[in-house]
């Protein structure tokens, strides 16, 4: 279903853009438009269906999935395809533009006006989602409303839901919906794909934050330099008014140097930037199963608190979230006060180092992290709290950077006492070949390694052999709402399968 925006007459929208109406009479000009979408399955009667060139197919090729709409917006190529292939339009007005991206932005801004809401964004390879949710949680604790654009909690029916950053129309619609709900802020994840493909439109961020950069999306960017340049674009050309940069990695240091000295920088390493007037010092310590942190501001103000999420990375991401909020003008004393009153930050992020345990069952952790760096972080965190054995379940996505699969096998084999290799989003790849590539990375004897194609069966097998002092780490899938196999998105919940496995464990069956 398309999120509804501000109703406009089609004729008024046309006048405000460079689109032209073709092959239809003026009777259509009185139609009202209240939504815009690029997702054919979600188009409704009063929507404009946007049909531009995609990565592999043109949007007009999906017209047969559109039941009814107010108009179709396409480019000259789309119009040519419609004419040559005699695609049905059901007497629907066809809008053709010579400037697809710029006209789409104008239309989206008219139907989904997003003035008067303050937007901040987070980019990087790992930590975007958790940092965004932590920032939103801190705002909520202070009584401040924040809308979010997220991959957490989406359903399989939302075709763009598992995009880190939604398509342009959906992003504007979500921000508008948050604004209508009287949100003060909106937080978004800015993926390299979204930045490259213009999915952020002409949105100017009040704060842009950079977490880190490690190898990922090499099927898209081909090399790390191209990947870095895509991320860097968010901090250039007035795309953001201020910045927060983690300089604990070489790419963070480089970004800071190349984008000017006005950014706030955060680091665990005191040798970086101590002379910088906007330097924030972070440090982390273990507190039981969770982590405490200390954050020292440029003025010397000290925040000491903790976060209930498992893993050092979440404590560091909390520090970054605090710096982001301070850059938005929120007093650090106010943030410190709510953390003290609450006894730390207590929250659950579905599929992000999420712990499941009942009675004397083994601890099961579900984590979305699928990059080499994120998987190693999860393995280290899980190993550190495990008295018994660490049993790991790993998968790798099809049609995504295959070079990391061997590294995943190497890491999981090194940290795990027992390893199950299973299938995830194989897409159009042979899942057995993906498993083999992971297995190739496992060093040493493989008697503790088992391939089980079914993720559900892998979960059950892992829980069945686990003892109460063992930990089962399900790495690489998280809370994804479906399995992407051979072009079909099959509804699936790993978290539900874990719950069922623990119920079976409790029953002794």
From Swiss-Prot:
EC number(s) on file: 6.3.2.-
Keyword hit for Phosphoprotein: no
Protein name: UDP-N-acetylmuramyl-tripeptide synthetase
Annotated Gene Ontology cellular component terms: cytoplasm
Alphabetized InterPro entries for the sequence: Mur-like_cat_sf (IPR036565), Mur_ligase_C (IPR004101), Mur_ligase_C_dom_sf (IPR036615), Mur_ligase_cen (IPR013221), MurE/MurF_N (IPR035911), UDP-N-AcMur-Glu-dNH2Pim_ligase (IPR005761)
Source organism per UniProt: Tropheryma whipplei (strain Twist)
PTM entry text: Carboxylation is probably crucial for Mg(2+) binding and, consequently, for the gamma-phosphate positioning of ATP.
Annotated positions binding ATP: 124-130
């Amino acid at each position: 279903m398309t999120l509804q925006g501000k109703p406009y007459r089609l004729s008024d929208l046309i006048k405000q853009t460079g689109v032209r109406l073709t092959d239809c009479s003026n009777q259509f000009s009185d139609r009202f438009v209240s939504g815009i979408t690029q997702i054919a399955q979600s188009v409704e009667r009063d929507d404009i269906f946007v049909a531009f060139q995609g990565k592999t197919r043109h949007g007009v090729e999906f017209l047969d999935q559109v039941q009814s709409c107010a108009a179709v917006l396409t480019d000259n190529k789309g119009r040519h395809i419609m004419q040559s292939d005699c695609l049905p339009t059901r007497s629907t007005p066809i809008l053709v533009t010579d400037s697809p991206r710029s006209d789409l932005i104008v239309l989206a801004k008219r139907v989904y006006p997003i003035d008067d809401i303050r937007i901040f964004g987070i980019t990087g390879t790992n930590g975007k989602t958790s940092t965004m949710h932590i920032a939103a949680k801190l705002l909520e604790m202070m009584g401040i409303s924040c809308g979010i654009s997220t991959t957490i909690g989406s359903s399989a029916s939302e075709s763009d839901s598992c995009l880190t950053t939604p398509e342009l129309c959906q992003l504007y619609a979500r921000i508008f919906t948050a604004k209508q709900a009287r949100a003060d802020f909106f937080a978004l994840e800015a993926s390299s794909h979204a930045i490259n493909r213009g999915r952020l439109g002409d949105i100017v961020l009040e704060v842009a934050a950079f977490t880190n950069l490690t190898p990922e999306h090499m099927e898209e960017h081909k090399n790390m330099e191209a990947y870095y340049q895509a991320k860097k674009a968010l901090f250039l050309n007035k795309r953001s008014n201020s910045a927060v940069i983690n300089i604990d990695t070489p790419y963070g240091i480089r970004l800071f140097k190349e984008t000017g000295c006005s950014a706030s920088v955060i680091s665990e390493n005191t040798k970086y930037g101590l002379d910088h007037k906007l330097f924030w010092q972070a440090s982390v310590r273990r507190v039981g199963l969770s982590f405490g942190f200390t954050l020292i501001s440029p003025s010397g103000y000290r925040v000491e608190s903790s976060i209930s999420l498992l893993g050092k990375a979440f404590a560091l991401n909390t520090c970054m979230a605090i710096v982001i909020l301070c850059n938005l003008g929120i007093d650090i004393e106010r943030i410190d006060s709510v953390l003290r009153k609450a006894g730390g930050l207590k929250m659950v992020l579905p599929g992000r180092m999420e712990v499941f345990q009942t009675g004397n069952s083994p601890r099961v952790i579900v984590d979305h992290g699928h990059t080499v760096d994120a998987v190693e972080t999860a393995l280290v965190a899980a190993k550190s709290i495990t008295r018994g054995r660490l049993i790991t379940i790993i998968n790798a996505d099809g049609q995504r950077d295959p070079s990391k699969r061997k590294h995943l096998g190497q890491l999981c084999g090194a940290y795990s006492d027992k390893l199950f290799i299973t299938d995830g989003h194989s897409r159009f790849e042979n899942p057995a070949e993906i498993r083999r590539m992971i297995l190739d990375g496992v060093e040493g004897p493989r008697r503790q390694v088992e391939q089980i194609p079914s993720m559900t069966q892998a979960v059950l097998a892992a829980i069945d052999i686990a003892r109460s002092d063992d930990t089962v780490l399900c790495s690489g899938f998280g809370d994804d709402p479906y399995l992407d196999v051979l072009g079909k998105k099959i509804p699936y919940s790993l978290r539900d399968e874990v719950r069922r496995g623990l119920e079976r464990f409790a029953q002794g069956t």
